Amino acid sequence: MHSIRLVSGLALILACAPARKEPEPAIPKPNIDPGRVNRPQAALPAPTPQADSVQRLVPPQAAYAHGWMPLASTGVDRFLRAHPTYDGRGVLIAILDTGIDPGVPGLNTTTTGDPKIPDLRDFSDEGAVSLQPVAPSGDSVVIAGHRLGGFGRIRALNTAGPYYAGTISEIPLGQPPASDVNGNGTVGDTLPILVTRASDGWVLFADTDGDGSLAGERPVHDYLLGRETFGWAPRGRTPKLTMAANLSDSAGTPRLDLVFDNFGHGTHVSGIAAAHDLYGVPGFDGVAPGAQLLGLKIAKGAQGGITTTGSILRAMDYAVRFAA
C-alpha cells in the first residue's frame, strides 16, 4: 500500500493487484466528465447507518478492546492524545482499490460531523450496466423477463419517458456471499434496474425488496448529488452489499455504473485509514478519523482485485480534479 501526496489537502492510497499491461491507446473513457465535477456541500445529510445484521467473529466492542485496530505500535494514539485536532480534518484521502462499502458503520461521518465519503466512482467497469429503451404496459414493465408492477411510481416523476432498463447479474460478481446481492441464499439471480429522467437528472429505480413492484421504491440519484445508496434485501432486512450509482448523460441517453465493494479490500483499507467510531464504538477509529475519503474503484473484486493501467490513470486524474 502506497501513500502519495498529490496536492494540498489530498492524499492518495493505491492498494490492488499489479496492473496488467494494456494495448495502446485503449484507455477507457471516464464515467463522468472529470472537468465538470462539483464538490458536494457538507450540509447534505449523512447516510443513515443501517442495522448491523452480519454475523461477526467477535462483537465490535470486543474487537476494539482486543486492539484489532493497533494504533499504538505506530504511535498514532499518543500523537492524537497530544494533538487531538490533528486527526486528518481538512484532508481528503483518495482510496484507489476495490471500492468502499458506504453502509459500514464508521464510514459515515468524520470527527467534525462532515460526510466521510463525499464521492464514490467506478473506474473498473465491473458495475457497468447496459441500458436499453423499454416501454411500459399499463401499470407494469417487463425487464429481462421480470414483470414489475407499480409503474405509476415512475410516471409520477416522468409521465412521458424515455425509460431505460438493464440488469445486474450475480454470477459475474465472484464467490458467495459477496455475489449474493439480494441475500436470498443463491448466486444465480439477475436483478432488473430502471432508469428515467427526473427534474434534477437521471435516477435509478430497482425492486430492492423483491416484491415484484416499484410502488414503494425511492429514486436513487448519482452519488455525488446527495450521497444516496441502495441495496437488495428481503423486506425488513439489511442489504448485504451497499451500492451507489454513477449516472451520467451521453448525448441525451443515460449511462449507469454501480459502485460496490464485492471483495472487501477497499473497505478494509478505508477503515484503517480513516474510520470513526466503527460500529458505534466510541474511539474505535482509524489512523485519521477526521479525514474524508474519496472512493475510487479501480479493481474488479470478482477477479481478485486486479486492475488496469487505464483505470488507475482515470482515477488519479479524477482525484486531482476533485480536490482542486
Spans of features found by a protein language model:
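Post-signal peptide N-terminal segment of mature Sec-exported envelope proteins
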Residues: 21-55
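Acidic/histidine-rich, surface-exposed loop or edge segments in extracytoplasmic proteins
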Residues: 55-62, 250-251, 293
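N-terminal Sec signal peptide cleavage junction
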Residues: 16-18
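Short, intrinsically disordered, charge-balanced linker/junction segments flanking boundaries
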Residues: 315, 319-324
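Sec-dependent signal peptide recognition
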Residues: 2-9
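Short coil-to-helix leader/linker segments, especially the first N-terminal amphipathic alpha-helix
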Residues: 63-78
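Subtilisin-like serine protease catalytic core
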Residues: 79-174, 178-182, 186-200, 205-242, ...
